[in-house]
Amino acid sequence: MSNQTAQQPVLCIDLKKNRIRIHKITLHMLGDPDFIQLLVNPKSGLLAIKGTIPEDHLGLKVHKELLTDGNCYEIHSKELMQTLQRVRSDWKNNQSYRIYGKCNESSGIALFAMKDIVQMEDALAHD
């Protein structure tokens, strides 16, 4: 990974396992929140991750002790994956994708353009 991509928020979308992996660096860039929201704008094709408060009914608790190998926070949701595939019909079932985004640290939000996906190599997708 180049130094430039090491400084960008990143998430992986795994359609085979119906999960989104939010890399630890992304959470760190957001201020290591205890709760996050995952937002999808179908019209603009954007995904957003932002820190939130425990009282937010749309918030997801980040169980930091369960971060996969200390690197990723995982969200498993078949319904979410189906929604993302309706937005991006070119995404293939049983494939994994990586998206690099941009972080506005002062606003506590990371934005990802779904058009900027990179299909992951099969060897990397079989973790």
Placement of each model-derived feature along the sequence:
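Short beta-strand-centered segments at strand-helix junctions
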Residues: R19-G31, I75-L84
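Short, surface-exposed charged micro-motifs
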Residues: V10-C12, F35-L39, Y100
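A broad, low-specificity signal marking well-ordered, structured residues that form hydrophobic/aromatic
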Residues: L11, I20, I36, L47, ...
